[in-house]
Amino acid sequence: MTDIKNEEVASEKKSLNFIEQAVEKDLKEGKNGGKVQTRFPPEPNGYLHIGHAKAICLDFGIAEKHGGVCNLRFDDTNPTKEDVEYVEAIKEDIQWLGYQWGNEYYASDYFQQLWDFAIRLIQEGKAYIDEQSSELIAQQKGTPTQPGVESPYRNRPIEESLELFKKMNSGEIEEGAMVLRAKIDMANPNMHFRDPIIYRVVKHPHHRTGTTWKAYPMYDFAHGQSDFFEGVTHSLCTLEFVVHRPLYDLFIDWLKEGKDLNDNRPRQTEFNKLNLSYTLMSKRNLLTLVKEGLVNGWDDPRMPTICGFRRRGYSPKSIHKFIDKIGYTTYDALNDIALLESSVRDDLNSRATRISAVINPVKLIITNYPEGQVEELEAINNPEDPEAGSHLIEFSRELWMEREDFMENAPKKYFRMTPGQEVRLKNAYIVKCTGCKKDENGVITEVYCEYDANTRSGMPDANRKVKGTLHWVSCNHCLQAEVRLYDRLWKVENPRDELAAIREAKKCEALEAMKEIINPDSLKVLPNCYIEKFAATLPPLSYLQFQRIGYFNIDKESTPDKLIFNRTVGLKDTWGKINK
């Protein structure tokens, strides 16, 4: 298993430089006319996850830093898996992260140009129609140490391949009956050079072009040419595309054969993927989670999708902070999710509005406080931000407090509510606990205390020191709310490797393996919580800190009649302590 890596900020910045230095070197040498143009090329077959966010920050960040442009290009070459829903979701996620693309393109914009290029390759003897099955073609490719076997169709007459290629697109040829392959080198050590498939038949309607096309280009054939058509100067990809780069370059060479491309061609550079502990990020696995109901949709706050993080309460800046910390390298590492959560805490500490909420309530009665009296006390919205202002919170004789904040027989260093001990009620008074009431089962139903009227802010004894400060809400001036406590979706540190190991050992499908390692406690719903009324005035997705509990946000499903709050992250990394 890959070691957990938490790199120091200095080394992270240094690791990013290998890409920046390459770009700056090109600019100094006058390549590409001194311009920088990048692209973010997602396939619209699912929702973006935090791994895509790393690529987005690089693609858009490099362009911004050097006064260039980053375009958005949808790699829509597989109509069976693509949908307009995903297109719109991807655009929303990019904008939420704070970026705006220069132009919006689609690989389908170039279908005619790619088709014409494929025709030319057939005419030049560089491509042929192969009627073998996909299984046989794969077998004939050989291994990295053994050369492949040439297809019996490799030298089929050019006119015959041309005629069949046109039939592939006319609808006369069934899916899987034949493919178009580039004629390169079946003995090349790079497996991608062994006559790669560049076109196949897909009869499913395309979300943009309808039924115009039945023959569709493969990724390797469409990607580099699309970069070239758009004038991309720096094509930034993850490490698995290192072995694809020679093919990327070859197709561009063939496309512009006989012309000098040294100073005007896309340059592919690879960086490491984002791997995160306690997280699965393959779209295939995420789709399984959604389809099988193991999560509540793509934006379930337990999902590593950008929309899931947004709903959970992560801010764009917190994701940027995390990506800055891990940097970009040329080797894979498993990054500790605690580093992401730390970035979220750091950011939310400066922006979250502080409010009072009680999630496991027990009634606290101040026996010497006048019945019917209500005071409005000032509560600071954010002590880290003086400009955030304050709001008023009502105080009365009967309050809700956290059940965990009372102990009838407490140890010596217990500084919360216990008989005979004083604590301060946040923003209010110092009180002394006098006892409690229990039901027939011994469950505490009420806690009693007396208050010192001289200890409110501005009073003579306001600065009297006590060791414990507790939060509360007034019973008659609060709102009932549902609180959703989200935790890590997986029980194991590296679910990707664990999933593969289980499937190999049991010869089972992904779903069965997932059920073995999914965390059954990743969501706890608390329906009877109480929160101060001020929270109901805030818009959905507002960043909040429930004092002494953690960071939360208002869920998109929350209504005035049913308030719903999601836990974003705790105030401290309790998971790390539990699992030590």
Ranges and model annotations:
Residues 1-14, 580:
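Basic/polar N-terminal segments that are highly enriched at the extreme N-terminus
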Residues 14-91, 206-238:
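N-terminal catalytic cores of NTP/NDP-binding nucleotidyl/phosphoryl-transfer enzymes
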Residues 30, 59, 90, 121, ...:
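Residue-level signal for inorganic ion chemistry
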Residues 41-44, 73-81, 103-112, 135, ...:
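Conserved short loop/turn motifs at secondary-structure junctions
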Residues 72, 76-78, 84, 106, ...:
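Active-site cores that bind ATP or allylic diphosphates and position pyrophosphate for catalysis
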Residues 86-112, 117-120, 125-128:
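A glycine-rich helix N-cap at a beta->alpha junction
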Residues 241, 245, 249-251, 317-320, ...:
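Core subunits and conserved enzymes of cellular information-processing
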Residues 263-343:
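Long, charged, mostly alpha-helical binding arms that flank functional sites
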